[in-house]
């Protein structure tokens, strides 16, 4: 089949599988961030999202909270202006972005595997795996599909650069990465991937890439810390948020193994878990660590550029999701095994 046929199939399959979810209503933080948030009801309020958080309190009349998600809130406002408070269109936007992400995954693997069948299969796993359910179906977590969309767009642009990295292409890549950061701070993963790729495979691009990415990150820091004065928040009800660095590191093998286990056998999924490993033993530390090392070594032996990028992505991603990250909330989250 031709490339366009595979892309069309991904789009059709995605719409077919997620069609019923379009008719779900607003739940949880959807109401707080959209329905009960007057800032999302007027397009003129979009600049306020770059100077504050995602919630609203009438007492202070400004965006409040611990999350810095200006692009997601701007998207909510745009949808609200076009369609009102009908949740169908919010779900539709989130699902279409997720389908686009699956197409990006297909294009990424196709770039290195030089075939269509296997990349198509891998993109379907990304598209349909239940572990992605919260990121795709919970409107308040639209930031997950957004940061991945812009990060992947930037990465694919960099990977498709041939001999010359023009100023225009560099600017577009940097802009997409900035949008990824404005979607969620986890967009820093794609900055790391871009640097790793350039450092290892395209050293001739290193200086312009480092300069542009540093400038991008500085702009983000200015908006987040200088303008919005947003620090990283914590979830006080989560034991992991109160744990020491050593305790977090002790939990890392068990958490990573739990993600892998859930990916292979996604049964009885829950939004968040709050267990912790308090005592080191074979079952909760040494065995998971051994399995992870074996898998990593196997991946190293079967080295490929796509495998390296995927491995680096997961290493960086788990560094943000697992215990050593200072803002860690729950021990295990459905959000973001892939995204």
Where are these regions (language model features)?
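Polytopic membrane enzymes that build or remodel cell-surface glycoconjugates and lipids
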Residues: 1-339
């Amino acid at each position: 089949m031709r490339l366009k046929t595979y892309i069309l199939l991904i789009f059709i399959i995605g719409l077919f599988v997620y069609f019923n979810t379009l008719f779900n209503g607003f739940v949880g933080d959807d109401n707080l961030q959209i329905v009960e948030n007057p800032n999302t009801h007027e397009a003129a309020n979009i600049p306020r999202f770059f100077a504050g958080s995602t919630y609203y309190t009438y007492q202070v009349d400004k965006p409040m909270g611990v999350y810095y998600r200006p692009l997601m809130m701007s998207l909510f406002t745009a949808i609200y202006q076009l369609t009102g408070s009908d949740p169908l269109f919010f779900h539709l936007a989130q699902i279409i972005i997720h389908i686009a992400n699956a197409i990006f995954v297909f294009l990424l693997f196709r770039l290195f595997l030089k075939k269509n069948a296997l990349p198509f299969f891998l993109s379907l796993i990304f598209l349909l795996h239940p572990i992605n359910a919260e990121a795709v179906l919970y409107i308040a977590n639209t930031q997950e599909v957004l940061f991945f969309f812009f990060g992947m767009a930037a990465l694919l642009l960099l990977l498709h650069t041939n001999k010359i990295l023009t100023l225009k292409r560099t600017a577009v890549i940097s802009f997409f990465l900035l949008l990824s950061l404005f979607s969620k701070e986890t967009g820093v993963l794609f900055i790391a991937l871009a640097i790793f790729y350039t450092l290892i495979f395209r050293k001739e691009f290193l200086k312009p890439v480092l300069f542009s990415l540093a400038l991008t990150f500085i702009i983000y820091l200015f908006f987040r810390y200088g303008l919005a004065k947003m620090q990283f928040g914590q979830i006080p009800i989560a034991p992991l948020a109160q744990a020491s660095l050593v305790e977090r590191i002790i939990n890392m093998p068990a958490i990573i193994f739990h993600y892998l286990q859930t990916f292979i056998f996604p049964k009885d999924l829950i939004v968040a878990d709050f267990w912790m490993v308090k005592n080191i033993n074979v079952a909760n530390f040494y065995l998971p660590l051994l399995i992870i090392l074996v898998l990593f070594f196997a991946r190293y032996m079967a080295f490929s550029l796509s495998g390296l990028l995927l491995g680096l992505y997961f290493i960086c991603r788990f560094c943000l999701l697992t215990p050593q990250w200072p803002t860690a909330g729950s021990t295990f989250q459905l959000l973001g095994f892939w995204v």
